[in-house]
């Protein structure tokens, strides 16, 4: 009796990277926008008046909510076919939920922002505003769940396959939002210590979640540890995470004891934003270099064109421009109304 030897091999065609830097920008800005909307909704439904902080959070939310979809459309393949999500709904997939939540979130948020500015400029309020705030918050929750789960359900990438992924993405975006609120607040603001404590507790929760994720006896945790052991670049990114986390936490701790100068507040927000962005870059782009079938890593070099550095700088430039344009337009209207 003879036994034939069967050799099975997996052959894969070379292919371009699936997600481009545009996707990192989308996940970065939409996370901050969702956290800002949730915080603003909390302030709106409180009994205490916090109109200044609510308007500040709404400004952050609306500018990020405008920037994020533009980055997403640049990353999508065959953008003109986005209407297929609505013509042929597939509710068992996570991406169509994004096509539902994203326009609803942006629309409700824009109406809420306009209602707040009308109240601030003309002292005219609407009962529907609180429901716009609630609708924006619900859509924000949907966006946070969808953006986390559309990645963490991918079993083909074991590093992504974890419930810790969406939690870590949410907490990293929340601490970045708190940093933006800190840098925009007045030094004598009575609510500044509460925001500082909010960021400290968020950073502590983020550190705990990431530590449990990496050290856990799960498929994802094991894959992360193996990646750090084998790939030198993974070690560098891990060191970057820890360094930025420590720097941000240190700046927050110092701010509780002594008021930070404007320079240190800028360094705080840059450190927090860098931590939020680097986590997304590492998990969304660098994880794609981990091989599925072969025994070697797939090196990725960031190009300088519209799919590389230009995309990153352009979206940040757009966001800053929106902040300046909207803020100065509102300030100009305020001065004109005050002086007739």
Curated annotation (Swiss-Prot):
GO cellular component: plasma membrane
Subcellular location: Cell inner membrane
Superkingdom as given in the UniProt entry: Bacteria
Presence of keyword Membrane: yes
Induction comment from the UniProt entry of this chain: Transcriptionally regulated by Fnr and by the TtrR/TtrS two-component regulatory system.
Keyword set, alphabetical order: Cell inner membrane, Cell membrane, Membrane, Transmembrane, Transmembrane helix
Gene3D superfamilies with a match to the protein in the record: Formate dehydrogenase/DMSO reductase domain
Oligomer and partners: Probably composed of three subunits: TtrA, TtrB and TtrC.
Protein family per UniProt: Belongs to the NrfD family.
Function: Part of a membrane-bound tetrathionate reductase that catalyzes the reduction of tetrathionate to thiosulfate. TtrC probably anchors TtrA and TtrB to the periplasmic face of the cytoplasmic membrane. May transfer electrons from membrane quinol to TtrB. During mice infection, the ability to use tetrathionate as an electron acceptor is a growth advantage for S.typhimurium over the competing microbiota in the lumen of the inflamed gut.
UniProt-recorded name of the protein: Tetrathionate reductase subunit C
């Amino acid at each position: 009796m003879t036994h034939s030897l069967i050799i099975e091999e997996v052959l894969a065609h070379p292919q371009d990277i699936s997600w481009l830097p545009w996707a990192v920008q989308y996940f970065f800005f939409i996370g901050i926008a969702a956290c800002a909307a949730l915080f603003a909704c909390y302030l709106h439904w409180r009994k205490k008046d916090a109109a200044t902080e609510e308007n500040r959070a709404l400004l952050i939310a609306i500018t990020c909510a405008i920037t994020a979809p533009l980055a997403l459309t640049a990353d999508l393949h065959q953008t003109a076919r986005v209407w297929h999500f609505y013509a042929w709904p597939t509710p068992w997939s996570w991406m169509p939920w994004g096509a539902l939540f994203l326009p609803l979130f942006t629309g409700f948020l824009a109406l809420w922002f306009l209602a707040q500015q009308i109240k601030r400029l003309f002292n005219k309020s609407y009962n529907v505003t609180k429901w716009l705030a609630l609708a924006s918050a619900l859509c924000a929750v949907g966006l946070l769940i969808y953006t986390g789960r559309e990645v963490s359900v991918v079993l083909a990438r074991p590093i992504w396959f974890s419930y810790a992924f969406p939690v870590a993405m949410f907490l990293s975006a929340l601490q970045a939002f708190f940093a933006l609120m800190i840098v925009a607040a007045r030094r004598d603001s009575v609510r500044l210590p509460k925001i500082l404590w909010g960021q400290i507790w968020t950073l502590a929760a983020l550190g705990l979640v990431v530590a449990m994720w990496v050290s856990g006896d799960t498929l994802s945790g094991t894959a992360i540890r193996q990646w750090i052991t084998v790939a030198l670049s993974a070690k560098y990114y891990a060191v970057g995470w820890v360094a930025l986390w420590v720097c941000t936490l240190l700046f927050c701790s110092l701010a509780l004891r002594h008021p930070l100068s404007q320079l240190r507040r800028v360094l705080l927000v840059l450190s927090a934003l860098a931590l939020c962005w680097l986590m997304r870059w590492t998990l969304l782009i660098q994880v794609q270099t981990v091989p599925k079938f072969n025994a070697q890593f797939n090196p990725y070099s960031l190009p300088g064109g519209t799919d590389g550095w230009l995309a990153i700088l352009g979206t940040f430039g757009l966001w800053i421009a929106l902040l300046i344009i909207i803020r100065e337009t509102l300030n100009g209207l305020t001065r004109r109304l005050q002086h007739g």
